[in-house]
């Protein structure tokens, strides 16, 4: 039994090769892999000993040879195949262990040149993977170090890998080469100025009970690249399996949390925040978020940007919640919530690096792609367009409200006071309708003065300003940009309201 080994990622390769050698396998390698294995004291054949042909073209041609591919592709159950191999002095190869040049990592470098990229396009590796994968009935193909242990275990127990394992590894190898080639194609098309073709690769991580509704089938997929503030890469510490709607809501909550560096907590329902608050510590942030809407939080999701403490966990415990998300959970907090068997607890990586990412939205027969809306301007006094300038307190409140309204379904209006939401108006077909909802919520809570209003889009008329003035709003932050901006400014001046234009819109559909 012979194994051809050539890996760029050398994780666990010495241990894997040693195990094969101890099981009586003959090892064949080239280049860096050959050096590493021989350096570990293993007896390994150089591929040149097999082909009788040297590496040429600076290593570009090493394994593209009939004595390699014939040994992989020849079917053991066909007499004519075996006779042809024998006539040409070709021995069979029963395993290929290959992973490829790091093309994706190379083109991710800011200073990468076309020459660097091209030299990291693997030719021999994909060819061997495809040959071995095609002949999976006779050949084991390994492209992932995570599979080393299983392969050794099966060979130890059975003398070879199991047929079903070889089929699975074959499928994995073809997936690996397909993704590799799609990455190269995407890069080369961009360099050539051709129309882009989009190649997406996501790994299925969970078959969901159902989708948005019980009659819809659904699966949860994860990007191969780990990112922060991600449900897909969270660690579940307790509770039931996540549902489709849970995942949608949790993702929306995490995008709000990432806006804040100070202690912050929010509650969310149906992808809209129902309560949010900042504070000097998590306890104050939680209290403000909860007090903002004690009713809507029922059956909702809570997310925070500080480790969950036992103190806050005790306050949460009596409330029916679907999910609690935090960067960490104090051991005592986990003990407090341990009796809530259905409550999903997600530990989420939260760093404040706003990695550029693409957002994909399916439409019937197509796909929309855009940059994630990770930008959010800091609110400053020089954005003021009215006669009255904002106080420091109003600036703080506007900054808070602006970060929240960005994540509310359009048309979106949020009113805030004292570092917490006082009312949220979401998803209405006209802006003044959303304003009425938010302002009435604040009024119902007894908050009727010193309010700050934030709008995700410009105010097309002065009616929202007029309405806001009747509910105790003293400051408004909006993008500006309407042909009737002057009407809104004039009305604000009449009412003594300070108003800021950010110059940036945050629609959310």
Please provide the spans of the model-predicted regions.
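Hydrophobic beta-strand scaffold residues
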Residues: 27, 44, 139-141, 345, ...
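Non-catalytic interaction/clamp surfaces of large macromolecular machines
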Residues: 145-146, 150-198
């Amino acid at each position: 039994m012979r194994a051809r080994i050539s890996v760029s990622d050398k994780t666990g390769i010495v241990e894997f090769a040693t195990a094969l050698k101890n099981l009586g396998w003959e090892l064949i390698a080239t280049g860096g892999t050959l050096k590493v294995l021989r350096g570990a004291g293993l007896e390994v054949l150089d591929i040149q000993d097999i082909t009788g042909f040297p590496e040429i073209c600076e290593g570009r041609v090493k394994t593209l040879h009939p004595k390699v591919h014939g040994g992989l592709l020849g079917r053991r159950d066909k007499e004519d195949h075996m006779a042809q191999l024998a006539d040409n002095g070709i021995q069979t190869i029963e395993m290929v262990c290959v992973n490829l040049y790091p093309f994706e990592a190379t083109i991710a470098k800011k200073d990468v040149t076309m020459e660097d990229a091209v030299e990291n396009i693997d030719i021999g590796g994909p060819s061997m993977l495809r040959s071995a994968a095609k002949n999976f009935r006779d050949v084991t193909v390994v492209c992932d170090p995570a599979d080393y242990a299983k392969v050794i275990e099966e060979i130890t127990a059975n003398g070879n890998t199991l047929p079903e394992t070889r089929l699975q590894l074959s499928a994995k190898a073809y997936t690996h080469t397909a993704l590799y080639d799609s990455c190269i194609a995407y890069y080369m098309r961009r360099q050539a100025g051709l129309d882009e073709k989009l190649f997406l690769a996501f790994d299925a991580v969970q078959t969901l009970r159902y989708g948005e509704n019980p009659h819809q089938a659904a699966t949860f997929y994860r990007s191969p690249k780990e990112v922060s503030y991600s449900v897909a890469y969270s660690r579940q510490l307790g509770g039931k399996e996540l549902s489709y709607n849970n995942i949608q809501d949790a993702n929306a909550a995490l995008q709000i949390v990432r806006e804040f560096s100070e202690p912050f907590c929010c509650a969310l329902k149906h992808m809209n925040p129902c309560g949010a608050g900042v504070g000097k510590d998590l306890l104050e942030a939680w209290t403000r978020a909860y007090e903002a809407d004690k009713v809507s939080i029922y059956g909702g999701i809570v997310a925070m940007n500080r480790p969950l403490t036992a103190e806050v966990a005790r306050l949460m415990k009596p409330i029916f919640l679907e999910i609690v998300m935090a960067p960490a959970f104090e051991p005592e907090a986990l003990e407090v919530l341990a009796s809530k068997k259905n409550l999903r607890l997600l530990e989420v990586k939260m760093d404040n690096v706003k990695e550029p990412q693409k957002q994909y939205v399916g439409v019937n027969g197509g796909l929309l792609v855009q940059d994630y809306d990770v930008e959010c301007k800091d609110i400053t006094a020089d954005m003021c367009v009215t006669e009255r300038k904002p106080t420091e307190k109003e600036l703080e409140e506007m900054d808070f409200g602006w970060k929240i309204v960005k994540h509310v379904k359009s048309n979106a209006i949020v009113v805030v006071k004292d570092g917490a939401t006082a009312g949220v108006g979401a998803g209405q077909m006209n802006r003044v309708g959303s304003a009425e909802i938010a302002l009435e919520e604040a009024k119902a809570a007894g908050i009727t003065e010193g309010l700050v209003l934030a709008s995700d889009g410009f105010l097309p008329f002065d009616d929202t300003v007029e309405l806001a003035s009747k509910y105790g709003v003293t400051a408004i932050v909006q993008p500006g940009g309407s042909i009737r901006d002057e009407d809104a400014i004039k009305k604000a001046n009449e009412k003594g309201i300070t108003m800021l234009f950010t110059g940036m819109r945050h629609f959310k559909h």
